[in-house]
Amino acid sequence: YNTEEHRRAVLDVARESMILLKNEDQVLPLQAESGCKVAVIGANAAAIHSNGGGSAEIKALYEISPLMGIKKLLGGNVKVSYAPGYVIPDKKEASEINWQAASTETAEDTEKESTVSGRALDEKQQEALAEAVALAESSDIVIFVGGLNHDFDVEGLDRVNMKLPYGQDEVIDALLKAVPDTVVCMYAGAPVEMPWAEKAKAILWSY
């Protein structure tokens, strides 16, 4: 347990499970020269994924997030900056706001939602989006790391649809408009819609 051999094995499994869905114009592999600025955007870049629930739970001694891995790989000669790009509400906010637009809501429910808890959260989302776009525009390389998290990639419930939560599609669209070579990395254990796929030059899928 936790031997060098085991660590190499799980690293190999993780690498082999990744799928390069798209790589136009040979955007990948990235060439981060000394002194360049790299923007890592998306909450999943800094999130811990191993502590799942139920049969998916792993008692990991440690986990290297994508953001940590990028910083470790590039070393001190490259400036790596991070922005979440979107806001993940706490459990109370999430219970009041339906990110996946369930059709059972009435017009009255929707109006109440948007004027009470939705307004403040939407302002935070727009601020996070603006921060991410500004960071992307000032960087040489842009990497978006998004997808699902344990609020949606769980056992015991069905997703209403296959849309990305937390307004991620809007964030990705804005990043691709600002920096067409933005690399999109998805972390998910189930399919998701990717309406921006035609615009993206590089898409990497990870489980």
Where in this protein do the model-derived segments appear?
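C-terminal non-catalytic regions of proteins with extracellular/luminal or membrane-system context
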Residues: 2-4, 8-207
